[in-house]
Amino acid sequence: MSEILDLSFLSEMERDLILSVLQRDEELRKADEKRIRRLKNELLEIKRKGAKRGSQHYSDRTCARCQEGLGRLISKSNTCVGCNHLVCRECRVLESNGSWRCKVCSKEIELKKATGDWFYDQKVNRFAYRTGSDIIRMSLRRKPAVNKRETVGQSLLQQTQMGDIWPGRRIIQEQQKEQSVLFEVPKLKSGKSALEAESESLDSYTADSDSTSRRDSLDKSGLFPEWKKMSAPKSQVEKEIAPGNQNAVCGDEGDMIFKKNTRKVLRPSEYTKSVIDLRPEDVAQESGILGDRSKSVPGLSVDMEDEEEEEEDIDHLVKLHRQKLARGSMQSGSSMSTIGSMMSLYSEAGDFGNVSVTGKIAFSLKFEQKTQTLVIHVKECHQLAYADEAKKRSNPYVKTYLLPDKSRQGKRKTSIKRDTINPLYDETFRYEISESLLAQRTLQFSVWHHGRFGRNTFLGEAEVHMDSWKLDKKLDHCLPLHGKISTESSPGLPAHKGELVVSLKYIPASKLPVGGDRKKSKGGEGGELQVWIKEAKNLTAAKSGGTSDSFVKGYLLPMRNKASKRKTPVMKKTLNPHYNHTFVYNGVRLEDLQHMCLELTVWDREPLASNDFLGGVRLGVGTGISSGEVVDWMDSTGEEVSLWQKMRQYPGSWAEGTLQLRSSMVKQKLGV
């Protein structure tokens, strides 16, 4: 039964269509089986005519097919190569290669070719034969899998509906009826409620569906967990309008995410580096809610290539794993810190340790003028800290970066040394880089403990500024490790991460088209906030060829969930991408903008791994307070504040600005 498919998400109409196709398939197979039986009967008739009867006497020199006598001189040329029987000339069938077979052997070969038996004779020895229509038929009739979180009431309800051929559908409808009591169901353009549209599609996970019904997750407590004092739109079905005449399409990146068996619950032992959930419990629960499908224009002629797996959210990672610390003395050889390495935040999925940084790292540097190559010889480490103090255990390894390049192509890693605080590596890394460019770089060594399931612990780091080293001399050095320097003062981080050109426009509810998708907030009708992502300039190269495959992701804080998230298409192989894409947020009142913040982050797309952070901005009033509460994300400064205030001051007009990208989304000091 493991072959049975889960087709409970199909609608009644879709199931009826599938059953009609299966009916036609059954009729065709029966007709084909009838044809095969006729051919087999013809073969049996030929064999019957050539069979010897016990009532008659036959000579040894007779034809095995027609029983006619053969001459006295019998040669091997009269023997069939298929059955080794003597056959007369009349019972032979010539083949294309000049050889011949008897009528029976030739008919058997013809029958196998015509019926495909030659294929099934081989297939049955390797596979258990079961047609696709049989599997679908069983899948449509089977009882759906038991939900781990199924209540007793749902279980009893299901038992009373065992006679229904689609038992899963009625349970889903009952759940939707219960949800409809909790909140008002908005209406779509078609006149049907969002839940009715969802019921018709039955949780279809196909990313490129042309269905006009859109998913609507409307539980206010799930959408706005942090924003209880402010009004919020009752519907999260987004309509995005651009200042252009391109057509609108559905571009929700969440469909592909939920297409990938997201209902499987992993045990902690099954977690890997790429699937560790670093978000708080309430955020993790929100991720189970399917987001809206939004129409995004302009720039819709470009295929939506951003349906990737959910990348790490930078603010949550920073909030969970970064703490401010002061750099200790380089000569002391040790420093106390609570660690959170921003350099490894994206490649190692966070730091899970809290250790006292101790020890040194020994290495040598050499620059080969002929090949323009930096050669790094990582020798050993001395007296590292224990990642597990109770068990006195450390599994250290060393990573190197030539800052500001933090891409995967720029990372080098040693092997992992088990159960030692004095690891001996003796490994060599090479960077092909010109002498002039190398002088602008900073070589960073970071030591990590390799934990189970990717839960790595930061053990310390050290830096070498390349402009202070004479490249014509070999450098042998042993540096003390120290805690992570805060990103604001780190000399390895670039001062310029690029620029993002955006335009903002707020349209009051009174100016929205009559009869359109006008959403209401608690205080009345809400307006529409449009964010036009035009282009980015001089982004950081994240690929080995000096380019990036970038896209922009946006959140309208404090709502950090899938209903608030927007993405642009991916612009490949360029550091100056033109996105020409618009985000639209409905149901926003003008007075709400005082407590909101628009966060835009630029990412490099990595298909088989987590994405690389390239920079970001936050647009808001920059007071540090939202709805009377102190928040980290209300930290806009300079042009970020000016552009936001200009948009608020002139409703209905576009406010455009060029914003410097931040190197990290850590809270900035206000008043700068």
Curated annotation (Swiss-Prot):
Zinc-finger among keywords: yes
Function, as annotated: Modulates exocytosis of dense-core granules and secretion of hormones in the pancreas and the pituitary. Interacts with vesicles containing negatively charged phospholipids in a Ca(2+)-independent manner.
Keyword set, alphabetical order: Cytoplasmic vesicle, Membrane, Metal-binding, Phosphoprotein, Repeat, Zinc, Zinc-finger
Annotated ranges, domain RabBD: 4-122
PANTHER family: BITESIZE, ISOFORM I, SYNAPTOTAGMIN-LIKE PROTEIN 4
Domain of life: Eukaryota
Protein name: Synaptotagmin-like protein 4
Annotated region (Disordered), positions in chain: 199-222
GO cellular-component term (any): transport vesicle membrane
Membrane topology label: Peripheral membrane protein
Cited Pfam families: C2, FYVE_2
Effect of L43A: Strongly reduces interaction with RAB3A and modulation of exocytosis
UniProt entry tagged with the keyword Hydrolase: no
Tissue-specificity statement: Detected in insulin-secreting cell lines.
Every C2 domain range: 357-479, 508-634
Naturally occurring in which organism (per UniProt): Rattus norvegicus
Gene Ontology BP, a term: insulin secretion
Post-translational modification Phosphoserine, affected residues: S201, S204, S217, S221, S274, S489
